[in-house]
Amino acid sequence: MKRLFLGLAIVSALWTAACSSGGGGTTPPPNPGGFGLDSLNGQYAFVTNGQSFTGSVYSLARVGTFTADGAGHITGGIEDVNADGLVTNAVDITGGTYNINTDGRGFITLQLGQNSIEFGITLTSTNDGLLIDETNTTAQFSTGSGNFIKQNAGSFAASGVTGPYVFDFAGLDGTSAPESFIGRFDSAGGVITSGFFDDNDNGQFISGAITTGSFVADSLSPSSLTSFGRGVVQIAGQNFVFYIVNGTRVRFLSTSLGMLSGDAVAQDNTIPANTAALNSGFAFLVAGSSGSGGLTRVGRFTASGATVSNVLVDTNDAGQFTQTTGATNASVTLDAANPGRGTVTFKGNGLTTPFTFVFYLSSSRQGVIQEITASNGGVAAAVADGTIAAQTGNPFSTTNITGDYALNWSGLSLQNGIQDEEDLVGQAKVTSLALNGSADIFQFQANGPQFDNAVSGSIVIKGDGTGNDGTANRNTMLVTLTKNGASTNVNFVVYFVSPQLALFTNTSTSNTRLVAGILKAQQ
């Protein structure tokens, strides 16, 4: 299976968006005049996932932290890099610069000794933002999507990783095959005492208990724990470097057995104890790869106890776009032995095999989800995972889908005869469901980074915007990118989680573009 890395990048960005800003407090409003240099001030943990080119194309994941001084300077930091399984640990960030426009868009340049990397960013608040890697220098050519979250330095102790956590790690196994690894663990003072995981490793399903593991300082860089929240841990036999964001979120990058990255988020006490407590519409998005190529599925369902209804699913499988409306044999279960873990299954469009997913809720409102649909041969039909979130704040309409939004998508694009990664980050003002803004897009080998594309387009909302009427009507979005007089239209199907967050995937019936992403309100 060819891994579609939007499954890795968007998981991180989506879960961050669904689980709030992650700063440990109330998200402050922007300055009355908009964002500025002082909007980025403090330590921020970042993650990106994508590709790099040094003689040949290879997969690349980064996790690290940088410190911004509120005046346009990066004063320090550290990062860990996994390049298709080749790990470089504890790379010092020696300096850098950044700029923030009033709309929250800007750039960050991180200096790594004699070399540098550059990110295009859009702030979603002063606590967090979305980014793409748009490094294009003689020393490095790389792209990828991700995000950054303000850290709480008061949480920089291994003993602070305490309580139940839900995690989602995705990427490559030790043979460079796609892997999705999700689950939960209980930690007491930085020592993992129990847990459970579901792993889809290149189509092979493995589930099991997590027994032991300890969050500790890294002997390679012991001081980085107290300075940056960085350390090492082993989970289910795999080694990771971690970065503490705060007491409720930890970021991870594998340092053995492949290239996995993701977040663990504290699980709260609102998770449903049984299916009788389920009573909501849920939107979800998974992305990854199938036997045909890149894959995205975005959709929604209503859970009323163990009953599942009003199912909508939109699948883009290597350019084959299929819509599922309604379903039979639909049900949802919860695993009493592993709090927050459950499964949902439904059959539609005459499929011989139903769609099946396993999920882990971090609260009653959000969690992570992994596809475990099996083919007729008993192996996975896809390696894909993503986010699941309860729909709130409906009806969605021109009244509440309004204001300033950050925009990010990632996936595959076929341009100039070359298929490789495409990443976009931008900002748009939504007025009467019309879009107006700017964005950077990186079509890797084909066109390189293109800055400051004009963004226009529109959103069409059907019914109350949730899709809970069970009809074939979908919300749609048209995004038009214009640069130097040339315009490109990209059509999407959109599922609103709330007035502040939407999930989308494009509806192309060819392999020229296969992307998925988020629209997140700026605060």
Predicted segments with their positions:
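Sec-dependent bacterial lipoprotein signal peptides
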Residues: 1-17
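Mature soluble binding/inhibitory domains
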Residues: 19-523
